[in-house]
């Protein structure tokens, strides 16, 4: 199922998902440093593997995904299937609502 078929995202619910499942490895604030994963500020419209100062896997650089609602929705279902060889150990969010909520939060928090 594509992002167009996803339920409407709730940014507040997405923030909770980010804090429990993503924040140990990622930051969203402008100017915040990288953790185990890259800072996600400015994520939408950026190509995968291009955040300055972060050491990406060759897989992330070579995949050249342009991050947006559709690509994030597919990626967050199963990151290792979407980008084989990614360093991201997160298994993914299986529920469409969880992915839609997280994307709604990321759109607000990384802009």
UniProtKB/Swiss-Prot annotation:
Which Gene3D superfamilies does the protein's record reference? Cytochrome c-like domain (1.10.760.10)
UniProt PTM comment: Binds 1 heme c group covalently per subunit.
Q: Which domain of life is it from?
A: Eukaryota
Question: List-wise, which residues carry N-acetylalanine?
Answer: 1
Q: Which Pfam families match?
A: Cytochrom_C
Predominant localisation class: mitochondrion
Which residues are annotated with the PTM N6,N6,N6-trimethyllysine? 80, 94
Give the molecular function GO annotations: electron transfer activity; heme binding; metal ion binding
Give UniProt keywords alphabetically.
Acetylation, Electron transport, Heme, Iron, Metal-binding, Methylation, Mitochondrion, Respiratory chain, Transport
Sites where the protein binds heme c? 22, 25-26, 88
Spell out the subcellular localization from the entry.
Mitochondrion intermembrane space
Q: Does the keyword rRNA-binding apply?
A: no
Q: Name one GO cellular component term.
A: mitochondrial intermembrane space
Give the protein's function.
Answer: Electron carrier protein. The oxidized form of the cytochrome c heme group can accept an electron from the heme group of the cytochrome c1 subunit of cytochrome reductase. Cytochrome c then transfers this electron to the cytochrome oxidase complex, the final protein carrier in the mitochondrial electron-transport chain.
- Entries under PANTHER family matching the protein: CYTOCHROME C (PTHR11961)
Q: Which family does it belong to?
A: Belongs to the cytochrome c family.
What is the official name of this protein in its record? Cytochrome c
* Organism for this UniProt entry: Abutilon theophrasti
Its organism's taxonomic lineage begins at: Eukaryota, Viridiplantae, Streptophyta, Embryophyta, Tracheophyta
């Amino acid at each position: 199922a594509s992002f167009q078929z996803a339920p409407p995202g709730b940014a507040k619910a997405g923030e909770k998902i980010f804090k429990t499942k993503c924040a140990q490895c990622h930051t969203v604030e402008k100017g915040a440093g990288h953790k185990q994963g890259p800072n996600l500020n400015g994520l939408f419209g950026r190509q995968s593997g291009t955040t300055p100062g972060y050491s990406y896997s060759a897989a992330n650089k070579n995949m050249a995904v342009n991050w947006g609602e559709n690509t994030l929705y597919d990626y967050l279902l199963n990151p290792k299937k979407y980008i084989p060889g990614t360093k991201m150990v997160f298994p993914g969010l299986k529920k469409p609502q969880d992915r839609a909520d997280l994307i709604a939060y990321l759109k607000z928090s990384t802009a």
